[in-house]
Amino acid sequence: MEALKQGADALFILLGGIMVLAMHAGFAFLELGTVRKKNQVNALVKILVDFSVSTVVYFVVGYSVAYGTGFFVGAEQLAAKNGYELVKFFFLLTFAAAIPAIISGGIAERAKFWPQLIATAVIVGFVYPFFEGIAWNQHFGVQAWIKTVTGDEFHDFAGSVVVHAVGGWIALPAVILLGARYNRYRKDGQISAHPPSSIPFLALGAWILIVGWFGFNVMSAQTLDKISGLVAVNSLMAMVGGTITALLMGKNDPGFVHNGPLAGLVAVCAGSDLMHPLGALVVGCVAGALFVIMFTLTQNKWKIDDVLGVWPLHGLCGTWGGIAAGIFGSQSLGGLGGVNLNAQLMGTALGVGWALLGGLVVYGSLKVLMGIKMSPEEEYEGADLTVHKISATPDREVSW
């Protein structure tokens, strides 16, 4: 029976890893559909290459930073318990690789290709796993200290803060240091519209992310005996809440409609194992509204050129999710309890602060040492031709 349980657990978390791996296709198509046609190839290549670099760096360095264990032992030892530790690495890698995928959407259309790969390596090798180890592996006694002060540890079941808020708040200084796309905000005060190049591809990306998210959340249990239907239904309710609110507040704009469910899912990750489904619905509704309001503010009023709105979507909705777990996870609001609002505020603030510092240091250093932004000429030409020497539809542009 023990062998059967080990095999089932390995299969369970492997399937979770595959589902979250598929989410990276969602990141790619969401970005492809949002950017202009001259940057579509770049969007696809970036996500795949970022994932590949993340895999190597997380295997060699990042996983050890987070969990204090490495893979520099014999294959016989690695294969123990049906290779559970290896597939656990695979699953957690897909989370780590989401960080550069999130950042990619914010810096799209004008970031240099190679400096971003260096940033990916540093972020996935150290910046992200440092906080991951604090939140999920009791590093440095931070969780014990939070529990001493508040009575409970910081709770983040599936990464509202650890993954999404950290990714979004790293992206914010990256976007600001990079600056806006050429002529996005004109000297006369007007804003040049850059509408999505393909709503169908944007929608495809959103749907792939939505489906994969159920692996992201449900399989965060990591073993089969800890699986909970509550996590699945809470994820569903937050998703639809975000969709409906974004539909209403975004005035039926398809970009908002397809990002609304993602906002809800980002926010519910932290407390999806604790909340009542109606609480999850409220969390998703708030997240959908938060995304629409803050995306509009950042783009139009504050003139922060965050192309996919990754700071509102992941940074702010992830922050809300960390806090919401302490509100709607409480027994007084129908949750399972065992969570504390003060603990959630402390853990969330720590994650946000670390991400801001990490983003500022990594992208600030790269800006000084090698530059992070394309020239106006390269940007005008587009990243597809500038970096990859081919456009998304060469057959339509050149007579062979």
Task: Name every feature range the model reports, one short phrase each.
Residues M1-W400:
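Hydrophobic alpha-helical transmembrane bundles of multi-pass membrane proteins
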